[in-house]
Amino acid sequence: MDLNTINSMSYEQFLDTFGNIIERCPLVTAAIWSQQPFASVTELENRVFDFIESLPLAGKEGILRCHPDLAGRDLMRGTLTDESQNEQAQAGLTLLSAKEKETLGFLNLQYKAKFGFPFVICAKMSDKNKIMQELGSRLQNEQSEELQKGIAEVKKICHLRICDLFLNEKLPTKL
């Protein structure tokens, strides 16, 4: 896919193509469509990030709430988005032992109870051990710090998803 193709897309085509660059949050894609044409992939990405940063606190929390629990209910039910399914599988979250599932489930519950949104990490750039370690560590953070960290992870996920769409090739999974 090239930039000319993107810039000539109808609203529906754009939404179909980019609607999940922010997990289950097509509103972001809908909002930036009218900012075409994009001079570069970086500009498209920056428009997404600017939109997210312009949101009030409740909007940013809403974006985080659109993310599924890692190795959670949606994974078990098979209701993850294709992108999340692939990202969680790549991180080894589809192959957890019973003990690992229990530990991750417990940490996910603690995290949601404390912060009011699920733990978000760029699974594609991580693995199950790092994810559990990071989840335990981030439970010690304050609300404002965790909101910033969560949004930073959303941006990493978005970046990799945009790259996948534009480059249509396998990208490095660890930065």
From Swiss-Prot:
Organism, by scientific name, is Xenopus laevis (African clawed frog)
**Which molecular-function annotations from GO does this UniProt entry contain?**
2-oxo-4-hydroxy-4-carboxy-5-ureidoimidazoline decarboxylase activity
Q: Where is this motif: Microbody targeting signal?
A: 173-175
Q: Which gene encodes it?
A: urad
- Could you tell me the EC number(s) of this protein? 4.1.1.97
Q: Which reaction does it catalyse?
A: 5-hydroxy-2-oxo-4-ureido-2,5-dihydro-1H-imidazole-5-carboxylate + H(+) = (S)-allantoin + CO2
Q: Where is the active site?
A: H67 (proton donor)
Q: Under what name is this protein listed?
A: 2-oxo-4-hydroxy-4-carboxy-5-ureidoimidazoline decarboxylase
Q: What does this protein do?
A: Catalyzes the stereoselective decarboxylation of 2-oxo-4-hydroxy-4-carboxy-5-ureidoimidazoline (OHCU) to (S)-allantoin.
